[in-house]
Amino acid sequence: MLKKIALTLCPAIVGSLLFFTAPASAHVSVKPAESAAGSWETYTMKVPSEKNLPTTKVVLKMPKDVEFQQYEPIPGWKVSTQKHDDKSVSVTWEATDGGIQEGQFQQFTFVAKNPDKAEEAAWDAYQYYKDGSIVEWTGDEDADTPHSITNITSAKQVTDEHGATKTEDDSENSGSSALDITAMVLSAAAIILSVAALVKKKRA
């Protein structure tokens, strides 16, 4: 009975998960989601075409304190930069051929220097379609068209396998603790073997 219920519910659960995760995967995104302060990072912007029209242009506004440095050339796209009055910089990728067709995506790679302090970097992107319509990826996390976020962390911070943030000192302390425990275990094993050998010798 339980097996039947599980078999019935599994497709529904999987379908629900796909329903909720699919729209997010179609968003314009900038990766990595986390980067060290003060570093030169290689970022990748992924742009899917959500309409039955080609995407012909993408404009990405650099977050505050993030300094655009260079880009990777892509056949079929020309790149230009523009400085604004607020000292921010926008980078434009414009198609010289067919653009991003329906059902396709394109990745744009560039290098930028991160700010020297920890902060959130919000990537505002503007996606232009062939009919002149524009999708503004500038909203917050819960918006229909959210901007991508990169967490700029302290240079000494790292993220462990559970997603928790810790400093390099913590990592070193963890390593030292592990070595101490190993040494204690080996010492205890040596003592046990010594006692066992002594008892055996006395019995003999």
Curated annotation (Swiss-Prot):
Entry keyword annotation includes Cell membrane: yes
Signal peptide region: 1-26
One Pfam family per UniProt: DUF1775
Localisation per UniProt entry: Cell membrane
Chain ranges on the Cytoplasmic side, renumbered to this chain: 200-204
Compositional bias segments (type: Polar residues): 147-157
Keywords in alphabetical order: Cell membrane, Copper, Membrane, Metal-binding, Signal, Transmembrane, Transmembrane helix
Region (Disordered): 146-176
Residues in compartment: Extracellular: 27-178
Record-given protein name: Copper-binding protein CutI
Positions marked as site (Stabilizes the metal-protein interaction): 137
Positions with a binding annotation for Cu(2+): 27, 50
Organism: Bacillus subtilis (strain 168)
Entry's induction text: Significantly induced under copper-limiting conditions.
Summary of the function given for this chain in its UniProt record: Copper-binding protein that probably plays a role in copper homeostasis. May act as metallochaperone, possibly to facilitate copper uptake via the CutJ/YcnJ importer. Preferentially binds Cu in its oxidized Cu(II) state in a 1:1 stoichiometry.
Keyword Metal-binding: yes
